[in-house]
Amino acid sequence: MSQDSLENVVIIGSGPAGWCAATYAARAQLKPLVFEGAITEENRMAGTLPLGQLALTSEVENYAGFPAGDLAAFLDSALPEDRRMMMAPHAGEGVTGPELMELMRQQAVNFGTRVITDDIQEVDFSKNPFTLIRAEGGEIHAKSVIVATGASANWLGLESEERFKNRGVSACAVCDGALPRFRDKELVVVGGGDSAVEEATYLTKFASRVHLIHRRDELRA
């Protein structure tokens, strides 16, 4: 294997952790390569499109450094036109999920990170250099691999669910519970495990009433 075909660092995943790792690696002159994920219907339904779950979130109120205000001029100067065209117009309420993720991506790219819009299907960690198999075909060899694939929300799979994401349907109470659209409303949490009960308890701070719906006759929590 030639040195030209061997990567120093390959990062799998394009959420906040992936871009932060890429920025650090790029500033350290390691020339990282990020596989940000493929743009496919399967990934869209699973919530694993490029830029991670945060890109599916509207308002982001709990990330330091972005108070409410008009960021339109800053976004115009910080992001290339082709990336700005992929986002909804800035509404002026602070930073949105897609905007925050595009800024993280651009910061990593500015320092020399290379990005491939494809999935990694398999990694052989049995020997170094490691071998990564691309979904589109072909292999990548790397001295180091950072897996930053994050988590996937556990949606119900209802036909109408997709239509109401970020319009009243959420998969994260801590992320969204304090937003105005949920305050002083009757809210429903579906599930009976530890996470469901923790989320329901948290939402009592904001909701007028919280209903916990579980398919069994007793909670697993």
Where are these regions (language model features)?
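N-terminal Rossmann-like dinucleotide/flavin-binding domain of flavoprotein oxidoreductases
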Residues: L51-E139, L219-A221
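Core beta-strand elements of the Rossmann-like FAD/NAD(P) dinucleotide-binding domain
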Residues: S5-E7, R134-S144
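Rossmann-like dinucleotide/flavin-binding elements
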Residues: S2-L6, I11-T40, L49, K165, ...
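Conserved catalytic-core motifs of eukaryotic protein kinase domains, centered on the activation segment
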Residues: M45-G47, L54, L156-S160
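Generic structural signal for helix capping and beta-alpha/helix-loop junctions
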Residues: E42-R44, F125, L156, R220
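Glycine-rich beta-alpha-beta "Rossmann" dinucleotide-binding loop(s) and their flanking helix/strand
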Residues: V145, T149-C172
